[in-house]
Amino acid sequence: MEKTKNKITLNGIWTMSGHDENNNKISVLGTVPGTVYTILAENNMLLGGGEYDIFFGNNADKAAWIESEEWIFERDFDFCFTDDVKKVEIEFKGLDTYCEISINDSVISSCNNANFCYTFDISDYIKNGKNTVQIKFLPPVEQDSKFIQRDYRGAFSGQRMYTRRMQCTYGWDWVNRFVDMGIWRDVTIYINRYVKIDCLNARLNGITPKGAVMELYLKGQHDKKFFDGAFKDRSYHFETSPMVCFTVNDPDGKEIYKQKMLFREEVLTDYVTVENPKLWFPAGYGESYLYTLTAEVMDDCGRVITEKTVQFGIRDISIVEKLDEKNSEAYKTAEKMFELMTDKFAGENEFASFDLYVNNVRIICKGANWVPANPFPGNVSADKYKNLIRLAKDGNMNMLRVWGGGCFEDEEFYNLCDRYGIMVQQDFLMACGNYPYCDDFIEDPTEDEALFVENLRNETEQNVQRLVSHPSIVWWNGDNENQCCGNLNLINNARRISNEVTAPILRKYDGKRRFFPSTPWGGNYNNSPSRGLCHYTGYLHKYSDFIENTDMTGYVEFFGSFISRFANETPVLSCPTESTVKKFLPPEEMTAESFDGYIYHTKNHPDERYKNFGLFNHIDTGAKKLFGDFKNGSDRIYKMGILGYEWTRSVMESIRRSEDYSSGNIFWMYNDCWPALGWSMVDYYGTPKAAYYAMKRTSAEVTASVTYEDSRVVINISNDGIESKDARVKLNLVSGEGVVYSEEMTAQIAAGGLVKLAPKNIEKFILGDNKQDAIIVCDVMCGGGQDRAFYSAVSPSKLNLSKANVIMERKDKKIKLKTDKLAMFVWLDGDYVFSDNCFILLPGEEKEITVEESFGHSSDNISLHWLNS
């Protein structure tokens, strides 16, 4: 954060004016940061008002007219000129998107990038006393249509390809269309800001026996007229250039380094050796220690003109991609994965590992994709960021990928990831499209294309400088799914943007952090399970065929078959809690046979093959096939929710058994942009779905799974910790009437290791005519923690389960559950985060659950569901 004296915030109340869909004049007061949607909601002019009303039912369509109108934002402010005032600037951290800015009726500039912070010198426009700033916003789609339209296609909408704003809000398969306009970040006036720090960072140069050698890097600007005597600000005194004072504090706040330097050049570097450094590790592998670097720009008398502070972590990151030896186990696994591939992969016979090391420790990456937490991103509060990032850590995740169709998130997001040890992959903001480019390969390049490339270059440079200090960012991705042609087209626009725009900027500011030109990335044709970054969302048709055209027998093995060296998008589909669905669907639509409300809030994939079997059909059909016919609307929601649990469990248990081959799995997706069924693990309101609890369980340091291999039942115990573990294992064979067989074992699991145990003579109970009568439940007790895995030879809907009676007692923040019979998929539904959920209870077993209110808590009700109720 940069601290500068002499500034005036223009956040607060502005006047917004325009016309409604009937051309009636609108003029209202609204809060900035704010956009057209949020200000109309603030004034109860969107379907009764309130942020959530626009999300209820199909109300969003009734406000679509907003995107076609021009809107004017205006406010007055007072300014007092003194003899010392020599320079006045106005800074807009976020303007969405095409707009014209005026001060006192004089146009000062226009803007065309919502991802860019604009600063303008308004010294010649401002006056003593009352001043007026006005911003006229123009409809983005109308502006985009004015540019030359070559073959610039985009998934979901081609109306976004020139426009540098949040791409997903043109409509995606998980969010409605919300093409908004407005001021979505802070507005500030700066007086006599002759010095500005653009970039401050501490980079690890290496670790020696003496300590960690850190390069302190500062890039800034200063107005030379301020220092060479052309004019003087009486607040400060200079005989020469200003001074920069670097200060480093350790994680305990103790000052360990201080050094002053003359600020003569745009870039300053200094070096400090940190003795006995406390290293930054991702969650689950150690503490995420943060040091503090402050740069103060001073005059000769030591008075501070401006200062900037960043936190940094001392960590060494490397990604090892080593070719597999032919006939090795990894090579054989890679060959098997060709069964998933298309003809485009034919002939590919070189495979390679993908292993992330932090401080020489191999990291197994577990997490999900982050999308904007609101279609109006200025509405995402610090509390919502904290809730979501904390939930990720509590869910045993250690990585989020910031997806390229959203935005560069607020500083608070990255600060929280630094603090909680959540690693970040950061995409640059291009997704699922062919974006404009301009170079020698373009026939008759136009000014439109040249301006787009320059706009993109400025956006990239500014945001890299803003984010480079964060230790949580472990690598950059050039775009999302724009280079899936791989080596078949080496001169496509996306590859040229990565090579000629993005890569040079990263070499300049962040040369040591890895850059992948795109994701997926790897192999001759990108999206290979056998090397690099893979997107299994690109194989959605295989999931679709399995759900639509089979009875889903063997679903655990099917979902678990999709492993890769590093999966950057693994799909999972499900429904949120009933308490959440009630927030965005009216009661009649929760039970209607048409499912129009569900489909509206699920959206759909643009591929023609999903026209008649859309994403909602995947959820609805999959839930019915796995868990049986729906008893009522509430049961439908319950079963569509636990579909996500079983899908996630199947994937992650397979990954945990395959960590010699696969080093990471990032689900599509972590959070929601609006209230929806679909892909997320945590819903829009901050309430975890069943998939989240499966992720939490299977991503724990020690976790188990039960498989049937080579005619034997096998217990697999995985340890992702950095120390070996001793475990006690108890296996129970449970029928509808009770436990019919038990066995206990012990095991020692090496750090980063996998142990396979073979129980005795249990196969006969789960084979042949008996396979639907019992399940295997395996408890692993290790270091004070416990994991419970289960195995069934048939789908849950085919099990012969006796009806269980589960009793719930609730007191304060504790819930006690007790059952008389085996209870499958016990699910607590409410606006809460539970310490555990969607679990199995053995006959006569009691279980205690702790609860805390979720971020969007609005009801104290908790309902209880289980499969054999």
Q: Which sequence ranges carry the predicted segments?
A:
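Secreted/periplasmic carbohydrate-active enzymes, especially glycoside hydrolases
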Residues: 1-375, 381-399, 408, 657-658, ...
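Substrate-binding clefts and catalytic carboxylate motifs of secreted carbohydrate-active enzymes
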Residues: 8-9, 16-20, 179-182, 476, ...
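Alpha-helical packing segments of well-folded alpha/beta enzyme cores
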Residues: 72-76, 388, 395, 413, ...
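Short alpha-helical segments and helix-capping/turn motifs at coil-helix boundaries
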Residues: 105, 118-122, 170-174, 501, ...
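Generic structural signal for hydrophobic
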Residues: 391-392, 417, 467, 655
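Substrate-binding/catalytic cleft of secreted carbohydrate-active enzymes
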Residues: 399-419, 424-605, 643, 664, ...
